[in-house]
From Swiss-Prot:
Keyword Glycoprotein: yes
Oligomer and partners: Homodimer.
Source organism of this protein record: Euphorbia marginata
Official protein name in the record: Galactose-inhibitable lectin
Keyword Ligase among UniProt keywords: no
Function of the molecule: Lectin that binds galactose, galactose-containing sugars and gentiobiose. It is strongly mitogenic for human T-lymphocytes and induces the release of interleukin-1 beta and tumor necrosis factor alpha from cultured mononuclear cells. It has a strong hemagglutininating activity.
Lineage: superkingdom: Eukaryota
Keywords, comma-separated and alphabetical: Glycoprotein, Lectin
Post-translational modification: N-glycosylated.
UniProt lineage: Eukaryota, Viridiplantae, Streptophyta, Embryophyta, Tracheophyta
An example molecular function term from Gene Ontology annotations: carbohydrate binding
Amino acid sequence: AYPGSHISGPNGFXMDVK
């Protein structure tokens, strides 16, 4: 939801974190 707020998930996809 926020630019640059993406982390690698357990499945290798980006997850939105504040």
